[in-house]
Amino acid sequence: GNPSSHYSVGYEAKEFVDTGRAQVAKAINASPAELFFTSCGSEADNWAVKGTAFTKARQNKKHLITSAFEHHAIMHSMAALERMGFEVTYIKPTAEGYIRPEDVEAAIRPDTALVSIMMANNEIGTIQPIKEIAEVAHKHGVWMHTDAVQAVGAIPVDVKELGVDMLSMSAHKFNGPKGMGALYCRKGIWPQNLIDGGSQEARHRAGTENVAGIAGMGKALEMAVTHLDERMAHEKELRDYV
C-alpha cells in the first residue's frame, strides 16, 4: 500500500515507514522528525551540499569548505556548485590522513555557508575529528555536514555528541537494501529541497516512499548497532593479527 494514502493497507505501510524511521533515528541518537529517507547516500550528500548552498546563497554566502579526499558524491557536488559561481576551499589532509580543525578554521570566511568533512574515509580508514570540526564551524555560524556513509553501522555514531547539523548514511553499508539512504538534519536546519512534488518526508523530499527499503534499512541498522561491540572487537582482533 501507499503510506500516504488513507485506507487500511496504506495505514499498514505507514506503520512500516514510521518503525523504520524510528529505528534509524534511535541508532544515531536523533529524533525521528530529524531523519529524511533518500534513494542512497549520494543523494543525501547532494542534498546536504547543494541544498545548503542554495539556501545560504540567499544570504550572500557562497563559499564552501570540504576536504581534498571526499567521496565523489561530495567532490562532484562541489564541482557542480563551482560551475554555478560558488567558491570551494579543499583542505588537504595531513600525511597520516587527517583533517585538522585548525586548518578548517583558517579557511572559514564571512561568506562561508558549509563545512562538509567525511567522518570515516572509505579508502584509508581514517576517522576524522568531526566533533572538534563542528565546534569550529559553529563558532563562526557555519553549518556542518558529515558524510558518515562509511561510519554508520561500523562505529558508534551519535549526532548529538558529534554536534553536526547534517549527516548522510547509506543502508547497503550495514547490510541493508541497496537503493536506500537517509539524511539527518538537526531540528531547525533545512537545506533547500532537491526533489519537489508531493508532501512526503515532511514536504522536504517528494516521491512515494520505498516502504520495503525503509523497513529493511531500519531493521538492518538496528541489528548492526546491537552487535556493534562484538563486531568491532572481532575486527580489532583481525587487524592486530595482521
Regions found by a protein language model. Give the residues of each.
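Pyridoxal 5′-phosphate
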Residues: G1-V242
